[in-house]
Amino acid sequence: MSHFTNIETRFQNLFYLEKALNKLDINHKPQKKVTNINSKSYDIDINLMISQPNGYDIEFCWNGQEYELIADTSFWQQKDSIKGFINNIAKQYAGEVIIGESKKIGFQPIKYQQNKDGSNTCYFTTLE
């Protein structure tokens, strides 16, 4: 039996979410409309969809505040657990936001490194 779960995230910017997914080599498709889930009719705007081999796709849907992850947890087929999957995307998303927004205010990243603990460090310089 299918059970779709909505998982709250803090992903609020589609551009940076797509950049994070691309950097993590997570294939996704933009914009789709779904009208039938679990034999119930819904009108849901899906902003990003990640296909899975079993046909139970993962979706990021805008709820008015953030992109929620919607997935059937019974048919999860990613290499990481749901929590690990979201954490990996969140870490990459945060880095993309920091770099992108820093560039907007005149900073340029000059060095990016991954630390032993799995965190990332980015060094910036000002553009003059």
Curated annotation (Swiss-Prot):
It is found in: Plastid, Chloroplast. Keywords: Chloroplast, Plastid. Its main location: plastid. Coiled coil: none annotated. This is Uncharacterized protein ycf35. Pfam families: DUF1257 (PF06868). It comes from Trieres chinensis (Marine centric diatom). GO terms for cellular component: chloroplast. PANTHER family: YCF35 (PTHR39638:SF2). InterPro entries: Uncharacterised_Ycf35.
